[in-house]
Amino acid sequence: MVKQKKLSIFSLKTSIIFILTFFLIILYFYFSSYFEINNVSKAYITNQGDNTVSIIDLETLKILKTLKVGVAPLGITILQEKKLVFVGNVGTDDISVIDAVNDTLIKTIKLGTAPLSLASNSEETKVYVTDWFQNNVLTISADEMKVTRRLKVGVTPSGIAYNKKYKYQVITNRDANTLEIYNEHDDLVKKIETGNHPFGVYSEGDFAYVANVYDDSVSIINLVDWSKYEFMVGAHPYNVKVHNKTAYVTNTIGDTITVYDLGTKKIIKILDTGETPENLDFNNKQNLLVVTNWGSDSISIFNTEGFRHIKEIKTGSQSRSFGDFILQ
């Protein structure tokens, strides 16, 4: 009887251990899968021609999902820590907010005007939107999901970038051929002349970089002493970004990317893209350059270490993504 009781206790303990082990294994695989899914680097491509966003896994280089948003999506910015994607819809005068964990549309923010380019501050509390038609920059609270400020700026504000070092909003005024710089309190710090028809802009450290569409050039502006110099690129440059001390410029006529070494001040490579390349962004995990091709409804992907063309992926109609569009 005692022996049987001991066996029963042993069997019970064994069963409990087995159940706990099984439960822990399930938890392990669940959370491993969860973190794996949420650590995937993705590109969010706004397709202005069919009112969608193509979501692309940058590890497998495959489209994960095509999401319907507002009419004529163009500008974009991503809050990396909050995992939120803000998409500007020109045709419906609003912003679509996407949850980047589940890739679902969670909010539509009415603006009452057409959004062009988007950027966000480093604290991820504010999203800035250029209002081309009314010459404003709108500030959206990322927490309240509503417009909290309309700042009057120069004529036809086009591109906008956020400088983390100085907490500046850096804005191109296309038809005025100027760059305007505002601090975190929306005070004008400086207005400076650029080349002809400035559009895309990028800013980090002590510099701002501006693509001058009609001059086939890029202006580099020192944010400390306000000196500047220019270098020539391909025909009709649309946007510029810097990665590892190298400037990359989209040339919409000629279908190329100019790769410019900022140290030697020389062009080191010309990359062939799809038709009418407009915007670009970088994936840090796989060292990828991703370029949106408005004319061929696609993205071109390159390795930034050897400038090797990896793949062209068909997306939606008129792919643009004016802003930061890669979730790292």
Model-derived features: where do they sit?
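Predominantly soluble domains enriched in secretory-pathway, periplasmic, or organellar proteins
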Residues: 2-4, 8-328
